[in-house]
Structures are given as C-alpha cells and as structure tokens.
Swiss-Prot record:
Its main location: cytoplasm. Signal peptide: none annotated. The gene is tal. Its EC number is 2.2.1.2. This is Transaldolase. The lineage of its organism: Bacteria, Pseudomonadati, Chlamydiota, Chlamydiia, Chlamydiales.
Length: 327
C-alpha cells in the first residue's frame, strides 16, 4: 500500500507550509504557503543570505523614505523567496501583506496590488500567486475589490463560518481556516478534555464551512491550515486543499495506514442548512458573539505584525551595516 501522503494527494491538493525553498522542494506538494513568521525563520540563514541582500539593495534604490524603504524590502524579500519556491512546485504560492494594515481597506488594496505587480515584474506568473489578506471585515472588503481586478486572494485567519461566508460573498478565490489555533483556544479555555478527533473543535469548524460551501455550490476553495497533529489532517481528507508543515508531511510519508475520504460534497448537499445573509453590522455582531474567533483573529494579527516588526529591525540593522561599509 502507498503511504498516507500519496493516498491523501488523491483526495486533496497538498500544500507545503514553509518559507524554505529546499523544504518545499522535498515535500512533493502541489502548492506552497508562507507568511512573515515562516520567512523570519529562514531569511537570515547563510544559505539564503543572497535573497535577503538583493532585496535590501533593491529596496534602498527605490529612493523612498525610511518607512517606504522597509515596505519595499519586506515585499521584495517575500517575492524573492516565492520565486525560488515556485521553481520547485507545479502550483501556486500564497504571500501575505503586512498584518498591520488589517483594518485599512485602501492600504491593503495598494499593498496587494504592489505585491502582485512586483511578482510579475520579477518574472512570476500572476496566475500562480495568491495574496493573503486577513479575515477582518475590512480585509474582506479589500478582497472584494482585488478579486474584481483579477488579483486572486487567500483570506487567512479564518476561525468561523461567519468569516467564511463573508469571504465567499466577496468572491475570494480561497480561504484558510485555522484548525490548530481553534483547537488551542478550546484547550486553553476549558482544559485538556482529551478530545477525540471526531469532537476536535478545529476539525468541526472546517467541516461545517465545507458543508456550507458545498451545499450552496460556493466556488471559493477551502484550504485547511494550522494543523497540530497528523490525525487532524486525516480527519479533513477530501477538503479542497490542506496546507501542512514539513514535519507533519514527513509523518504522513512514514505511515502506510489507509486514508479514508472524510469530506464529500455529495454528502454536504444532503444537509438541512439554511443560507445566512450578512451585513456589516450582523457580521460584527456575530463575531462579537464568538469569543474564540474574536480572540484568535486578534492574536493572529498581533503575531504576524510582531514578526514583521522583528524582520524590519533585522533589515534596519543590515541597512546600517551596508551604510557603514560604504562610508
């Protein structure tokens, strides 16, 4: 029998969640995702120093002010790594805009357009790029505009059905519901209850979103993310896409146990589910009613923003070093 990774590839598109081009290559996945946290882990490794150096020099040459220069460099670093990664996969790469813009529609649109244009200018195929936008109300409005302009979006930091419905209404190409972070919240809030995989809150959330989308023929793709265990991954076999860390991908490759399709669009269409209409006020009310989604969305934005700031600090020091060497 083939290993679980190969079996799973027949049921879902496999996406490697890493900023390391070499790990993505070794993964054998179709697509890849990255974010500031993942880029931060690899950007300063000696083997990738040239990708960082080139981005810094390029950013300085754009002749912006200090803040603009940092923004240019951050986006160029992402694009540099993305172009290396897509050499090793047949599919798409997801890149993320600055999380500090999560509540500014105009700024998110401008940054996403710039990132897309830069990716193309450096030789990337626009059809292979997804721009990750946070699942705030403002982020989803930015997605609505960007999708209409032909820029494919991945709505990230999805923690409940409300966000998923809003993203679908905005015609998002794809959403990323975070299985593991939902699970983390429930464990922190109520203690380790020893959830069986059938009762896993993160798995249940993605299953509900999947059922709603397939019931109503919504074309937005679902890419389950943020897995803590191999069991969570397997419990969502059949989901459109699964973005998985290199560690869990290795675990799947080492197991020969059979993989069962857990999510089926035909079964979803049989469910007695009513459509939900969302206005801005209703969206905000329902998010406020969901403590988990509210807290994890805020936390996710803070984490990504914090990692971006750390990366900016490293870049600033590197710029000073270049200036000192040129003096």
């Amino acid at each position: 029998m083939s290993n679980q990774f190969d079996q799973l590839k027949k049921l879902s598109t496999i996406v490697c969640d890493s900023g390391d081009p070499e790990l993505v290559k070794a993964s054998g996945s179709q697509d890849a995702t990255t974010n500031p946290s993942l880029i931060l882990k690899v950007a300063q490794e000696p083997k990738f120093q040239e990708l960082l150096n080139e981005a810094v020099v390029w950013g300085i040459r754009q002749n912006g002010d200090d803040l603009q220069t940092l923004s240019f460099i951050l986006d160029k670093i992402q694009v540099n790594f993305a172009l290396e990664i897509i050499k090793n996969i047949p599919g798409r790469i997801s890149l993320e805009i600055d999380a500090r813009l999560s509540f500014n529609v105009e700024a998110m649109v401008q940054r996403a357009v710039f990132l897309s244009q830069l990716f193309e200018a450096m030789g990337g195929d626009k059809k292979r790029l997804l721009v990750k936008i946070p699942g705030t109300w403002e982020g989803i409005r930015a997605v609505e505009f960007l999708e209409a302009k032909g820029i494919a979006c991945n709505v990230t930091l999805i923690f409940n059905l409300v966000q998923a419905i809003a993203a679908a209404k905005a015609k998002a190409t794809l959403i990323s519901p975070f299985v593991g972070r939902i699970y983390d919240w429930w464990i922190a809030a109520y203690g380790d209850e020893g959830y069986s995989i059938d009762a896993d809150p993160g798995v249940a959330s993605v299953s509900n979103i999947y059922a709603y989308y397939k019931k109503f023929g919504i074309p937005t793709q679902i890419m389950a993310a943020s897995f803590r265990t191999k069991e969570q991954v397997l419990a969502l076999a059949g989901c459109d896409l699964l973005t998985i860390s290199p560690k869990l991908l290795d675990e799947l490759k080492k197991s020969q146990h059979p993989v069962k399709k857990e999510l089926d669009p035909a079964e979803a269409k049989k469910l007695d589910v009513q459509p939900i209409e969302l206005t801005e006020s209703f969206f905000r009310f329902l998010m406020n009613e969901d403590a988990m989604a509210t807290e994890k969305l805020a936390e996710g934005i803070r984490i990504f923003a914090g990692d971006t700031q750390i990366l900016e600090t490293a870049i600033t020091e590197f710029i000073k070093q270049i200036a000192a060497e040129g003096a």
